[in-house]
Amino acid sequence: MINYQREYNLKEISYAKNDAICKFYIETTSIDLIKNIIKEGGYLFIGNTSKILFCFKYKEIKIIKFISKEMKIYKNLIVVDSGMSLSKLGNICNNNGISGFEKLMTIPGLLGGSIFNNASFLDQCISDNLLYLLIIDKQGNFRIIKKEEIELNYRKINIKILDEGYFIYKAIFKVKRKSFNELLKNKLLAINYRIKNQPQIHSLGSTFKNLSNIKVYQLIDKYVNFTEYNGYSICQTHKNFIELRKDLDILNLVKLIERIQEVLYNNIGLFIETEIKIIY
């Protein structure tokens, strides 16, 4: 399946809903097409954009979304396409008595991006039960990568034997069993935690990556003495969240992020990375 569009406005599919036109937008289930695109260059793979800001008016780039959602469950293995949402993956696993995704399923992302960002929530991490990744490298070769070949970091992975620009199209996980009641309990725990601790606003979730010993919202609360920039506001109930506004220039959101980074750097001497990927 291929959906191919020229001069496409990404506000139709992006969380931020701002005007950003790319030269080509392609949704596909075809691995062969993706292989050819990679060999041509000039591409960007996206998921559901829950962690992306498109900060351009027009860009000559191919934006690719892999939408294949096949999943097979074997006795000891799960094989899943990277285009499947964590929500759907979690529901299928819960219904089959498989643990490892019942808390992660509350993250509004696709599997591929979640692996690339080594997503975690509470005590579950997407890489916990990971065994292999099936990828296409930058040269267009199909590769199988063992978990042991992956450097797992906070909110990112690094496959040292590969150049950047590879594409993850499948993941293989080991099966870990739990009872239906345990899975339901964990799922409800995650949902209730989000309701209680995270603001119910239109946002891209946490703006900044936490440090190993302190939460960024605590640093913002301590050192940042402003609350908004040209209409964009720091959420006062959780200061690592910024509310999205369709009626405002997205570049002013970026400027607010940069101002926060500057203040924190001047006070603690560290540059705080964003969880959000900003595409110029």
Where are these regions (language model features)?
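Anion-binding (especially nucleotide phosphate/pyrophosphate-binding) glycine-rich loop
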Residues: 1-117
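A general secondary-structure signal for short beta-strands and their flanking turns/coil
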Residues: 21, 128, 166-168
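Short, basic and Ser/Thr-rich N-terminal targeting/leader segments
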Residues: 39, 46-48, 129, 202, ...
